[in-house]
Amino acid sequence: MSGERAKRFPLALEDLKRAPRKSEGRPGERQAAGAVPKAADKPAAVLKPVAVKPAAVRAPLPGIAAAKPATAPKPTAPKPALPKPAAPSIAPAGAFALTSERVRERMVERLRANGVTDARVLDAMAAVPRHLFVDPGLATQAYEDSALPIGHQQTISKPSVVARMIELAMAGRTLERVLEIGTGCGYQAAVLSHVARDVYSIERIKPLYERAKLNLRPLRVPNIRLHYGDGRVGLPSAAPFDAIVIAAAGLDVPQALLEQLAIGGRLVAPVGAQSGQHQVLTLVERVAHAQWRESRLDRVFFVPLKSGVI
């Protein structure tokens, strides 16, 4: 040990009271060494824990469940986009029914403007959905005042003609039994069912007879009786009738039908050439057992009245 070091050690008591010497060395080492005594000279303030009061939890209102704490959504893999289903080509029944009802109301307003005055006839025309009796491709034309094809060279009569013939047959009366010659698609029989107690209808073309049954089935009309047969012969088993409506034109009214008309009854029929020229809507009233009165009214166009069945 050198003489200088020997003088420094052991230290006297007064030497221990002196301030410690600064450490010698490189500047960086002196700075780092000096930082430790400063931190040690003054102890760091100790933070007291702050008492956190729990948030007041409100009791849930009666009838309302307490809300669950929100949780972070779990990441999910994106699903491939599915193609949207194609829209149905047919409108929903409820929506189309409303649309049909509105256009029927407009049709009835036109009928009233054209001279149909019997409220029962107008109500019957408003009640029957004509679009159900035509081909789907013609449904948009169902409430126009025009005749439309129904197949087998037959047509459904114009609404104005149907209303006019029924109003003439009624003449303000309440009808009991009505006979229709030429059922066709069943539309006129459906309208008649609203103004008469019993409706009998005859069709000579078997496919149309079957079609009329299908058309009328959804309407659940209980007072229509369809028959497949020769309309010129009528239906003697159900006679006499308060009214007879013929939906085809003959050169004259068959005598068998005149005989099946009740006294005081009315028959309405188009009469004229089979070609459709010079056809006239004719009213025949039976005034006595062997007496009928005839009135010629409007120009019309109907398919020909034929005999036999096919």
Swiss-Prot record:
It comes from the Bacteria. GO terms for molecular function: protein-L-isoaspartate (D-aspartate) O-methyltransferase activity. It is found in: Cytoplasm. The keyword Methyltransferase applies. Keywords: Cytoplasm, Methyltransferase, S-adenosyl-L-methionine, Transferase. CDD domains: AdoMet_MTases. GO terms for biological process: methylation; protein modification process; protein repair. The active site is at S157. Pfam families: PCMT. HAMAP family: PIMT (MF_00090). Catalyzes the methyl esterification of L-isoaspartyl residues in peptides and proteins that result from spontaneous decomposition of normal L-aspartyl and L-asparaginyl residues. It plays a role in the repair and/or degradation of damaged proteins. This is Protein-L-isoaspartate O-methyltransferase. It comes from Burkholderia orbicola (strain MC0-3). The gene is pcm.
